[in-house]
């Protein structure tokens, strides 16, 4: 039975960070409307209902951005609620979310664990390498906050992966990054 994979962008291209290499910043400037705003709960409900009607095997919902957590935890709680409500045939459902981790707190991590979300956490190696490109909207470094999000996911037992953008500088420091990831041992992270 074929898998249905659905990419959902709850916050369009909106983000709470300003990474130097992010293509969304340039792309949004080129649009006649820079952001399409947040996805409505009605649209979310329709997407889930229709995929459940047509599914025969696994459904994979993947939330990306911009930064999907900007849509708020309630949106994702509704997603799980709709999945349970419309899943009349015992279809297996996977949820995954790619995040910069900036907004993750206890409530998010508890939700991810309880609902078996696979999280992709964007972190670019060591503090020095990460903070070289990944800033908040005011140009401040973000590594400490993102590392705290990883620690919190470890504490809650959330299954997550690391997504590292390989810039020219990161490629030059690939061994250092790899050894850092091994040394830190992101507990639930797949390296």
Where are these regions (language model features)?
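Active-site neighborhood of divalent metal-dependent phosphoester/pyrophosphate hydrolases
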Residues: 66-67
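Radical SAM/AdoMet-radical enzyme domain recognition
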Residues: 48-49, 53-62, 71-191
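Canonical Radical SAM [4Fe-4S] cluster-binding loop centered on the CxxxCxxC motif
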Residues: 2-42
